[in-house]
Design a protein with these regions (language model features):
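Alpha-helical segment of the N-proximal tetratricopeptide repeat
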Residues: 8-41
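Terminal, low-structured helical/coil segments at or just beyond the last alpha-helical repeat
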Residues: 1-12, 88-116
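Structural signature of tandem alpha-helical TPR/SEL1-like repeats
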Residues: 25-34, 59-71, 93-105
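Short, charge-rich amphipathic alpha-helical segments embedded
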Residues: 37-58
């Protein structure tokens, strides 16, 4: 059973990497499909949620991008980069107060991490 879980995680990461390869080539729609497939395989694969949020934002699908970025923050609440990503997407959508809140959380986490 554990081996199957490890295989799924590996497949999800491989699928994410394929999606990222397409993203950097400008094949955004195709990358979104692969990010979504990676998430179907492993819903806790944070990097896939990050990639999905960025790709959706690039397409102007801001509501979906925000939802994906919020899921990333839910999965990695102590990671400043998760909050920074959410802040950037909120800013792109004109949600300035919300973006500033997310940025402040990111900065607070960065300061906390630098103290340890």
């Amino acid at each position: 059973m554990q081996e199957s879980g490890a295989q799924e995680k590996s497949l999800a990461k491989t699928t994410y990497k394929e999606g990222f390869g397409l993203f950097v080539k400008g094949q955004i729609e195709e990358s979104i499909a692969l990010y979504q497939k990676a998430i179907e395989i492993d819903a806790k694969l944070a990097i896939a949620w990050n990639g999905l949020s960025v790709a959706l934002a690039k397409q102007g699908k801001m509501k979906d991008a925000i939802a994906a970025a919020e899921k990333l923050v839910e999965l990695e609440p102590e990671d400043p980069l998760s909050h920074t990503n959410l802040s950037r997407i909120l800013m792109q959508n004109g949600l300035i107060p919300e973006a500033e809140d997310a940025r402040a959380r990111a900065m607070g986490l960065q300061m906390k991490q630098s103290e340890t």
